[in-house]
C-alpha cells in the first residue's frame, strides 16, 4: 500500500528502536514464550512499586479533586518543592522561575532543542546515547556525533569535545548515562565546562551562545564508590549555559506517573514554557500536587532510596559477575562494572561464529537474533542508541528482572555460547 504524501519530517522520522524491539518481545511473551526480557528501561511495579507515601498522596490528591488545568510552567508549590529538593540533595540553587515542569523528560528535552537549535545548528552528542539523534533530526540540527568507546566508559572525552566545539550550539550529556549505566568523571566534566565557558567568552554579544543540556535523570542511582557530579557545582559560571533534565521517573520507579522538571536560565525556561503551552505536555495536576508534598519528606525519600538502590545494585552485580565468569571460561563476552542507573553494559561479540545448525552469524543483528532464539535473552544493541551496526555492546536493563531467574538466564546463555564454533 502506497504511503500518502506527508511532511518531510514525518517521512524521514524513525520511531524508537527500543520501543519497537520491546513491543516485539512483549508480543512473544504474551504468546507464551519464556523470554528473559531486559530491553525496556522501565520497572515491574510488582517488584519496584512507587513509594507508598507518594502513592497515598496521589490518591488523596484525586480525592481532593485536583483535576483542573495546571499552570503552563507547573504549579507553584511543586516548583518550590523542586527548588528545596535540589538544594537539599544536590546543593543547587534554582528559584521557582528557573524551573519548568512537564510530563517527564521527553517534552523537556524536545523544548530545549526547539528553544535553542535552529536548522543547521551544530549539536554535539556522543553515541551510544538515548534519542539525541532523533531530537537533533526533529529540529533540523547538524549532527556532530562522537563515537564513544569502552576505554572511556562510553563517555565523550575532553579531546572529543575540543575538536568539535567551534560553531556548536548545543552539547548533550547524560550522566549517569542511558544506555550504559556509566558516569562522567569529575575531571572530564570540569574540563568540558571550561571548554564551553572559553568558547562562549570568545563569541560576540550578538552571537548565539553554546549551551549544555545535562540529563541527570538517574543521578541518585549510583553504586559503590561512584559519585555524581554536575556542571554548575563544578563551575558556577555554567549556570548561565546549562539546562538540567530531571524528574521522578527513575529515582522513584515512577515512569508512568509522568512528572519531570528542567532547571535553567529564566530566559530559556520562559521559552520552554511558551512551547509547552502549545504542546500541552503538562504533568497532571493531581500528580503535581502530590509530588510537591512528597519531595519535602526527606526521611521517606532516604528510606525508599536505600531499599531501591540495594535491589537494583544486587541485580546489576549478579549479572555482571555472571558475564565475567563466562569471559573467564573463554567465551566472547564481557561486562562493564556497574556504576549507576538501572543498566548494565555487556559485550556479546559472536560475529563470524557458526551455529550448531551451520548458520554463520555474519552481522551483529544475527548475534542479537541468535541469543534471543537460543538463550531466550532479549537485550538492546547499542546500534539502537546511534552506534554503528557492527558494535558488539548491549544495554541490559534490570527494572523488570526477577533475581531468582538470573542463574537460570546465565545458564541458558552459556549453553547457547557453547553451541557456537
What is the meaning of each model-derived region?
Residues 21, 38, 58, 82, ...:
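Generic structural signal for small/hydrophobic residues in well-ordered secondary structure
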Residues 60-207, 219-236, 362-363, 411, ...:
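Conserved core of the PLP fold type I
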Residues 125, 145, 173, 212-214, ...:
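Hydrophobic residues in well-ordered beta-strands that form the structural core
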Residues 276, 353-365:
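Short, surface-exposed loop/helix-turn segments at secondary-structure junctions
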Residues 292, 306-320, 332-355:
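Conserved glycine-rich beta-strand-loop-beta hairpin in the small C-terminal domain of fold type I
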Residues 55-56, 81, 234-313, 317-328, ...:
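Conserved core segment of the aminotransferase class I/II
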Residues 2-7, 11-104, 111, 295-297, ...:
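N-terminal small-domain helix-loop-helix segment of the aminotransferase-like
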Residues 84, 360-361, 370-379, 385-421:
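PLP-dependent enzyme catalytic core of the Aspartate aminotransferase-like
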Amino acid at each position: 500500500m502506497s504511503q500518502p504524501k506527508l511532511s518531510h519530517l514525518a517521512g524521514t522520522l524513525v520511531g524508537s528502536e527500543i520501543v519497537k524491539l520491546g513491543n516485539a518481545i512483549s508480543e512473544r511473551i504474551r504468546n507464551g514464550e519464556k523470554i528473559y526480557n531486559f530491553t525496556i528501561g522501565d520497572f515491574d511495579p510488582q517488584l519496584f512499586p512507587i513509594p507508598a507515601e507518594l502513592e497515598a498522596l496521589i490518591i488523596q490528591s484525586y480525592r481532593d479533586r485536583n483535576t483542573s488545568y495546571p499552570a503552563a510552567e507547573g504549579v507553584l508549590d511543586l516548583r518550590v518543592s523542586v527548588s528545596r529538593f535540589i538544594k537539599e540533595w544536590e546543593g543547587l540553587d534554582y528559584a521557582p522561575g528557573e524551573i519548568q515542569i512537564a510530563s517527564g523528560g521527553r517534552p523537556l528535552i524536545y523544548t530545549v532543542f526547539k528553544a535553542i537549535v535552529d536548522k543547521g545548528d551544530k549539536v554535539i552528542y556522543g553515541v551510544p546515547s538515548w534519542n539525541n539523534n532523533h531530537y537533533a533530526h526533529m529540529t533540523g540540527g547538524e549532527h556532530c556525533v562522537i563515537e564513544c568507546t569502552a576505554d572511556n566508559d562510553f563517555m565523550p572525552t575532553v579531546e572529543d569535545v575540543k575538536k568539535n566545539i567551534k560553531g556548536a550550539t548545543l552539547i548533550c550529556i547524560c550522566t549517569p548515562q542511558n544506555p550504559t549505566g556509566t558516569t562522567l568523571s569529575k575531571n572530564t566534566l570540569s574540563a568540558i565546562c571550561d571548554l564551553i565557558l572559553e568558547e562562549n567568552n570568545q563569541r560576540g554579544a550578538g552571537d548565539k551562545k553554546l549551551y549544555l543540556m545535562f540529563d541527570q535523570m538517574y543521578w541518585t542511582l549510583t553504586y559503590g564508590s561512584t559519585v555524581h557530579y554536575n556542571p554548575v557545582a563544578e563551575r558556577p559560571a555554567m549556570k548561565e549555559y546549562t539546562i538540567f533534565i530531571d524528574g521522578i521517573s527513575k529515582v522513584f520507579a515512577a515512569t508512568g506517573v509522568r512528572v519531570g522538571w528542567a532547571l535553567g536560565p529564566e530566559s530559556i525556561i520562559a521559552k520552554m514554557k511558551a512551547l509547552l503551552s502549545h504542546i500541552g505536555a503538562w504533568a497532571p495536576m493531581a500528580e503535581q500536587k502530590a509530588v510537591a508534598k512528597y519531595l519535602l519528606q526527606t526521611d521517606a525519600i532516604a528510606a525508599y532510596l536505600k531499599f531501591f538502590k540495594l535491589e537494583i545494585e544486587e541485580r546489576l552485580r549478579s549479572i555482571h559477575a555472571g558475564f565475567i565468569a563466562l569471559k573467564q571460561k573463554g567465551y566472547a563476552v564481557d561486562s562493564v562494572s556497574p556504576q549507576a542507573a538501572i543498566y548494565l553494559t555487556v559485550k556479546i561479540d559472536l560475529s563470524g561464529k557458526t551455529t550448531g545448525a551451520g548458520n554463520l552469524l555474519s552481522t551483529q543483528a544475527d548475534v542479537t537474533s541468535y541469543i534471543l532464539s537460543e538463550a531466550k535473552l532479549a537485550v538492546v544493541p547499542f546500534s539502537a542508541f546511534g552506534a554503528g551496526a557492527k558494535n558488539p555492546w548491549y544495554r541490559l536493563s534490570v527494572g523488570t528482572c526477577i533475581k531468582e531467574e538470573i542463574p537460570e538466564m546465565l545458564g541458558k546463555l552459556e549453553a547457547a555460547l557453547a553451541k557456537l564454533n
